[in-house]
């Protein structure tokens, strides 16, 4: 399934509603090579799972300069990826000593069984935050070393609770996982937590980003700043709409609206119904939850109907 982990995280999102948009978006993506040496220490192998939400496919990264190297993420479990890994290691006379998983989504963990099948010693070399049985934990600030590469783990929840990023100290670079993509923006589980994570990643001061999907990010700080600005703009847009609604209501009447009514104000009433129900409403709900955490909005439930209103 081409959507990979995004299908898992966005269970309410019917991707068919965005087919035209996504096909157009995908046609504009730069082509990435199946196997490409990105730097003296970083080799990228594409997961062969290109799709609407996985972009050109999941990027898996072989890191180090010596015979024994580590790999970050394992794609989705397609045999074509496993074959590419086998060819890559054989042609370069190198082996894998560690497997790091950025998070639990299937387009990042699906290749683990193939790696263990091909290289049985890796059964004791799988590392993940909130590990499954038989895996080793990854903690904030933990350091891992192979020849030519020092990796520092950074916990970055928001896209998923267990998400880890990895700083490559020798290059002042970061493997950003799904927190920062090479193109577009990532889906999130919890917007406020995700924005905190973006600020935390920005504070690492890394120059280059190696994302789990899409091309290398040459200016990671700029990319993160742009992402934060977009999210902040959505919040302001939502608050402004609630403010307009309050001004239009009679004095003394609580200006509370449903998510659907708020979307009418922000996006208009001519939005495709499927897009509204399957995408805009869940996203607006997440923005409102974040604003509620910030103490800027609140909600009430009357007769089973939740309505939202501004506090400021």
Swiss-Prot record:
Instruction: Enumerate the residues binding Zn(2+) 2.
Output: 107-108
InterPro entries found in the cross-reference section: LACTB2-like_MBL-fold, Metallo-B-lactamas, RibonucZ/Hydroxyglut_hydro, Sec-metab_biosynth-thioest, WH-like_DNA-bd_sf
Q: Which UniProt keywords apply?
A: Hydrolase, Metal-binding, Zinc
Q: What is its cofactor?
A: Zn(2+)
Residues bound to Zn(2+) 1 = 103, 105
> What does the sequence similarity comment in the record state about its family?
Belongs to the metallo-beta-lactamase superfamily.
Q: What is the protein's given name? A: Atrochrysone carboxyl ACP thioesterase AacuM
What gene is behind this protein?
AacuM
